[in-house]
C-alpha cells in the first residue's frame, strides 16, 4: 500500500512539473503551446482595435475547446467603466454573441441576458438610415436585416438581436424564456423580430401559445413575417399560417420576401415547392433570388426518403 501511494505521489509530482503541460481547471493538462494560443487571444481581446478583437473571437470560436468561452464572454461585456471605449462597439458584441451561440456553452446564458437587458433599454423604434443597394446581411447563413449595410455599420440593435437569437439556441432557462417573450413587445421592430427567431430556434412548441395574439397586433411588416415564420415553422401545418407565408412571397419589400422564403423552409412542407418556384420565376432582387433558389433546393430535398 505504501509503495502504491509513493508511486502515485511521484507520478503526480512528475506530471505537475512537466515542461510541456500546464494544469487547467476546465480541461486538465493543456500543452504549453496550446495555452499560449489562448493567452494570445486574451491579449488581443483586451486591445482597443475592434478588428483585432473580432479576429480573436473568430479564432476562439472554431477551436475544439471550452477554454475560450470566458474570453468571448469578456468581449461581449466589453469595458463597462469606460462606455466610450472601442471595446464596447456593437460589432464586437454582435460577433461575440454569435460566437457564444456556436460554442453552445450554458455559462453564456446569464452574461448574454445581462448584456441584452443593459443595451436594449436605450433602443428606439427604428433607425432612420438611408437604404442602399447593398442592404441585407451578407452570407447565406445569416438572418436578414432591413438596415444592415456592412460590418462598419453594425448597430447595437443588430447586436441585441444576435444576443436574443443566441439565447434561443441555448437551453432555455426561466429567465431567458421570460426575457425572450418580453422582447416580443419591445419598442424596436428588429428586436421583436429577433425574439421571434429566438423562439423558433428554441424549438419548444409550448412557447408559441401567445404568438397568434402578438401576430394580430403587430404592425411592422418585417416583424410580422418573423413572428409568422416562427409560428408556422414550429407548427409545420398546411393551415392559414402557411397560406399567409405564401402570400407574403408577393410583398413589395425584398427583405420581406426573403424572410417568407426562409419561413417556407422552416415549415418542412414539400407542398411549398410550387409556390416558391413561382416566386423565383418573377424575382428580380439578386440576393433574394439566391436565397429562394437555395431554399427551393432544401424543400425539394424533403421529398427524398
PLM feature spans:
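Bacterial N-terminal signal peptides
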Residues: 10-19
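N-terminal leader/linker segments that initiate helical-solenoid repeat arrays
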Residues: 23-65, 91
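Conserved hydrophobic register position within alpha-solenoid helical repeats
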Residues: 56, 96, 128, 160-163, ...
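Amphipathic alpha-helical scaffolding segments comprising HEAT/armadillo-like alpha-solenoid repeats
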Residues: 31-43, 65-82, 105-127, 139-148, ...
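Residue-level detector of extended alpha-helical repeat arrays and alpha-solenoid scaffolds
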Residues: 53, 89, 93, 109, ...
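Alpha-solenoid repeat junctions
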Residues: 60-64, 100, 104, 167-172, ...
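Short inter-helical turns and helix N-cap capping residues of alpha-solenoid HEAT/ARM repeat scaffolds
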Residues: 48-49, 80, 88-89, 119-121, ...
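Bacterial N-terminal signal peptides that target proteins for export
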Residues: 1-9
Amino acid at each position: 500500500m505504501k509503495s502504491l501511494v509513493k508511486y502515485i505521489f511521484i507520478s503526480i509530482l512528475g506530471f505537475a512539473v512537466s515542461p510541456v503541460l500546464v494544469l487547467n481547471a476546465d480541461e486538465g493538462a493543456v500543452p504549453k503551446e496550446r495555452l499560449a494560443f489562448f493567452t494570445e487571444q486574451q491579449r488581443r481581446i483586451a486591445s482597443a482595435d475592434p478588428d483585432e478583437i473580432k479576429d480573436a473571437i473568430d479564432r476562439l470560436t472554431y477551436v475544439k475547446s471550452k477554454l475560450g468561452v470566458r474570453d468571448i464572454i469578456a468581449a461581449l461585456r466589453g469595458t463597462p467603466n469606460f462606455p466610450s471605449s472601442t471595446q464596447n462597439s456593437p460589432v464586437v458584441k454582435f460577433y461575440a454573441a454569435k460566437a457564444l451561440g456556436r460554442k453552445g456553452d450554458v455559462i453564456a446564458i446569464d452574461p448574454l441576458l445581462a448584456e441584452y437587458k443593459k443595451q436594449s433599454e436605450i433602443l428606439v423604434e427604428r433607425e432612420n438610415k438611408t437604404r442602399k443597394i447593398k442592404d441585407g446581411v451578407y452570407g447565406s447563413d445569416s438572418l436578414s436585416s432591413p438596415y444592415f449595410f456592412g460590418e462598419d455599420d453594425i448597430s447595437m440593435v443588430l447586436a441585441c438581436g444576435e444576443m436574443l437569437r443566441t439565447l434561443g439556441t441555448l437551453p432555455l432557462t426561466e429567465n431567458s424564456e421570460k426575457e425572450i417573450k418580453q422582447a416580443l413587445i419591445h419598442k424596436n421592430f428588429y428586436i421583436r423580430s429577433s425574439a421571434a427567431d429566438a423562439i423558433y430556434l428554441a424549438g419548444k412548441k409550448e412557447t408559441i401559445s401567445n404568438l397568434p395574439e402578438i401576430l394580430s397586433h403587430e404592425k411592422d411588416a418585417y416583424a410580422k413575417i418573423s413572428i409568422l415564420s416562427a409560428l408556422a415553422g414550429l407548427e409545420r401545418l398546411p393551415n392559414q399560417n402557411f397560406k399567409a407565408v405564401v402570400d407574403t412571397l408577393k410583398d413589395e419589400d425584398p427583405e420581406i420576401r426573403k424572410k417568407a422564403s426562409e419561413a417556407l423552409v422552416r415549415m418542412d412542407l414539400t407542398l411549398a415547392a410550387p409556390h416558391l418556384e413561382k416566386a423565383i420565376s418573377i424575382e428580380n432582387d439578386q440576393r433574394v433570388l439566391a436565397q429562394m433558389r437555395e431554399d427551393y433546393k432544401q424543400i425539394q430535398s424533403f421529398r427524398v426518403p
